[in-house]
């Protein structure tokens, strides 16, 4: 159910209401990330909930749950703290005046419909210079395997959906399907984008076979007394043989062709001055290619400075609300 409040023919408040039917003709309402309005406007907040409660009574709704996207704090991932912005208490008091009950700043994901914490990558000039050493190393690992990052729209949907399905199977979770992603991209034609990490396994296999021949030749030419060197070369040969075996398994599915294969992906949506990474998927067989988050997120963040993402302040890596309320 869509709800809204107009003032002088201008929409000043809105909220998506999800309705869950319960036994005995009862139900519950849930407003994800809402309602959306100026929470400092106490009169507007009060009016919205008064009208919503009237609808709820007619619908035999036993309670209303909502988690407005209130920005309560910022801190570095290594410096957790429980500070709150001054406006937070003002918003809490406004909601409480509408008989809402604040359920607290829970840190357990099982207590909420959606998680509370959100990781942000802020837009920087020359972002490569501020990356952690660990991230730079992972990017180098991906570069050594010729992992490339491409971006597009509906033309990349098939590959992205396949990667999400693989993630669902691996994690035992239910995400969204191709039709849902298609709706997102169609509705955000100017703000939706799919990023894919790709690699050419055919070329990697050819390089591995050349390296195998070179190692075998070097082992044959190495003196038996040079045990340390032999051990190192044999370890490298075993690693190359393992890679070739894995490439063969991949060829059985994708065919042994000289082409790029999508191995990880992210679907992002631009809204206002932010960009939300909504969904991600990866082919586990390529995990040592390091295509997943660090290189992809870095490339997406670098992309914030292009014409596609104009004036973005940060990129969110999957989203979260700050507070949970119940109105009874």
Each predicted region: which residue ranges?
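A conserved beta-strand-loop-helix scaffold within acyl/acetyltransferase catalytic domains
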Residues: 1-25, 71-73, 78, 86-88, ...
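Acyl-donor binding region in acyl/amide transferases
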Residues: 26-111, 272-328
